[in-house]
């Protein structure tokens, strides 16, 4: 079947829109679909996403499509950019409408709610084995990407040709550098764990602990990510790249990060509900914390920072008490995986 579009993007929030803008700016005909028909009609009329990325105009190659069937019929390349807790639901909706030659990539960062499973497992459960899968991950704030500011990400998947094609679609010498990676598991994991550590970094700054404490959290958070990755068979080298250290540093140090701002509010004394309301958008790290904690427990992986953040978010512990418990842990030697 011939493509009438080069790629279809499912998810018209800030990140999905930003990726669609970037793809269309490369000259690729891009369809953007979202679940809310009213929102999609507004996007089509305004030719920008005023709700999430105000005043960033859509390129001519970007087309809005409110009909999921039409969006999926237009291209065999499907980029899913929805919150992790609805990832499986969106795939279920898409499944009967997918083309036989469809190839699925996602930029969703997180794990399956309640189970802590990787999104590749969710995708396989829903879609079966017939479709090539891939993931995009790395240090990207939607606004900067949409504005065309220099950005770098990584892509990995189950099919080398699909990975190569995605690099060609996404890469732009002027705005976006894309690195191919062969660690499908590692790229998915990095995007989930960094959200958790960013909440911790925000809490630390909200309390007023300073740059030393924030840097320690980032560094030891990277150790926790690496431990968990090793338990799942991921490459440790991945976590020194865009989807590991890169995304971790970005999310922990800049207030464009919703997860960091959420943590800041908690550190300043807000309760969880109030802190979430202050952000006004999905805070992926809230659910990610429970998912990562569940996965670590199941695998027997020690993740003390993640555990303390889980206790703050779900068991009512104060951020100050969580910090005290981390500082009071038994002394140990520093090694790459401790």
Swiss-Prot record:
It is found in: Cytoplasm. Sn-glycerol 3-phosphate binds at residues 109, 138, 140, 194, 247, 257-259. The keyword Amino-acid biosynthesis does not apply. Pathway: Membrane lipid metabolism; glycerophospholipid metabolism. NADPH binds at residues 14-15, 35, 109, 142, 258, 282, 284. PROSITE patterns: NAD_G3PDH. GO terms for biological process: carbohydrate metabolic process; glycerol-3-phosphate biosynthetic process; glycerol-3-phosphate catabolic process; glycerophospholipid biosynthetic process. It catalyses: sn-glycerol 3-phosphate + NAD(+) = dihydroxyacetone phosphate + NADH + H(+); sn-glycerol 3-phosphate + NADP(+) = dihydroxyacetone phosphate + NADPH + H(+). Its main location: cytoplasm. The keyword Transmembrane helix does not apply. This is Glycerol-3-phosphate dehydrogenase [NAD(P)+]. It comes from Shewanella sp. (strain W3-18-1).
């Amino acid at each position: 079947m011939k493509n009438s579009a080069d790629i279809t993007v499912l998810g018209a929030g800030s990140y999905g829109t930003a990726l669609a803008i970037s793809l269309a700016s490369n000259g690729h005909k891009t369809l953007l679909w979202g679940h809310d028909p009213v929102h999609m009609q507004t996007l089509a009329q305004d030719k920008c996403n005023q709700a999430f990325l105000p005043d960033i105009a859509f390129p001519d190659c970007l087309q809005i499509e409110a009909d999921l069937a039409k969006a999926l019929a237009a291209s065999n390349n499907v980029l899913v950019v929805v919150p992790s807790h609805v990832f499986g639901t969106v795939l279920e909706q898409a499944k009967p409408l997918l083309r036989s030659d469809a190839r699925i990539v996602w930029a969703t960062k997180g794990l399956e709610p309640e189970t802590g499973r990787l999104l590749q497992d969710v995708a396989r459960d829903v879609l079966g084995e017939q479709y090539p899968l891939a993931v995009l991950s790395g240090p990207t704030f939607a606004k900067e990407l949409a504005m065309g500011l220099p950005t770098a990400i990584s892509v990995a998947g189950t099919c080398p040709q699909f990975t190569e094609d995605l690099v060609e679609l996404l890469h732009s010498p002027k705005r976006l550098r894309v690195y191919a990676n062969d660690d499908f598991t590692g790229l998915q994991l990095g995007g989930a764990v960094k959200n958790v550590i960013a909440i911790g970094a925000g809490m630390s700054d909200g309390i007023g602990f300073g740059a030393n404490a924030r840097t320690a959290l980032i560094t030891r958070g990277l150790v926790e990510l690496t431990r968990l990755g090793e338990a799942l068979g991921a490459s440790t080298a991945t976590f020194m790249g865009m989807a590991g250290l890169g995304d971790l540093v970005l999310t922990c140090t800049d207030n464009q990060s919703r997860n960091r701002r959420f943590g800041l509010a908690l550190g300043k004394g807000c309760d969880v509900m109030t802190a979430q309301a202050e952000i006004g958008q999905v805070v992926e790290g809230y659910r990610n914390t429970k998912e990562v904690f569940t996965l670590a427990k199941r695998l027997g992986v020690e993740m003390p920072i993640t555990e303390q953040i889980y206790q703050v978010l779900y068991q009512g512990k104060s951020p100050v008490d969580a910090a005290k418990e981390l500082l009071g842990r038994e002394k140990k030697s520093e090694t790459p995986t401790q």
